[in-house]
Amino acid sequence: MTKEYIVIAFTENQIGELNRITALYLRRKINIESLKVSESSIRGISMFVISAFTTRETIDKLVKQLRNIIDVIQVEYYSNEELITQEIALYKITSKIFRESGTVDRIVREWNARIIEMNPQYVVVEKTGTREDIDAMRSELEQQQLLTEFTRSGTVVLHRDSVEDKLQANL
C-alpha cells in the first residue's frame, strides 16, 4: 500500500550529498513531494528531510541504499504520526481584491494566518501549519479566485522522541 513516508538523514556537510541522495529516489522512480536540507544542531552535520509517497517495501530498500552512502551518518524513515510536521506558505493577493472583499479577511482569520506585507499592489499572507491545512487554505483562496501567487517551504520536522540523541551516539 502506498503512503507518505518521511526520510530523515544526517550526513557530513559535503559537496554532492544532495545529488547522491536524490539520485537514489530517481533510480527507484520515487517522486519527492518535499525536500528540506539544513544544518542540524551539530555543527558540520546536515539534516535531510525527504517526503515521498511509496510502499513500505520500497522505502525499506531505499533506506538500506542510503545507509551505504559514505557520508551518511544516520538515516531512518517515519510515518507522519511519529513526527511533528509543519510547513510555511506565502499567498499573494492583489490589494484591490483584498480591500473590496471581506472574504480574504475572513479566510485569514479562519485559518489562523497573518498578513506580513501590504502595499498598493498586493497583500502577502503567511500560513504555518500542516500540509493539509496549507492546501485547504490555498484551495479556498483559489475557489474564490483571490490567489495570484503561492509558494511553500519543504516540510520541517521534529521527531516526537529525540532523533539527534541517536545521532550523537553514532558519532
Language-model segments: which ranges?
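Long, contiguous binding/interaction regions
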Residues: 1-47, 53-171
